[in-house]
């Protein structure tokens, strides 16, 4: 699953190319007419929601792309925000695409990296236009189709279930060692790895980076939080900030499916 560094890499790439572009079209093969799964009801996997989503976003201009934990937030005109969670195998791609008539598949044009086999699972396509009406495409590739795409009024961000209970961002200057200890103290009997991956305790960390930072600081993943000495916790806090920052510089980890918006692999997996 893409974690903080991968989502940051994606957001940084999108922020360079999306603002100012207008959404002129939308396609998906995920929407179901009688969506029975409750967790998909307010996402594009529900046909009724998707049609409303489409109505609200087409014609709107993209203002800004940002991140909160593992969530990608795309602010658009009309005072709405698109929320995308990549889940297990999702990643966003940007470039030139066309829909093949014979197969109905969306295929990249020109960019070899976009033709990477891991980028072929296209299930959502935003058609975009710049001021000169030149078209580009924002594509969501997701092999396992677990990704989440929804929409909310921007002013209601503090009420959104996916966002309102998230813990602090570990790379913010305000995330001091004291704050780190205070967050762990909320789960004193929890196993440290489990607590690190709890998004309500600290935002953005998952399996890959919790393993890396625990290994570097010499802490057993099954250690109980309250029993870890401050000396070790300080090493863990330092490792957390160092490893996450390093992975962002390297473009994230592509041991599995993750690719950046150009369809390229990150390089963190080569350095650990």
Give the predicted meaning of each segment.
Residues 1-4, 116, 170, 174, ...:
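Generic detection of long, well-ordered alpha-helical segments
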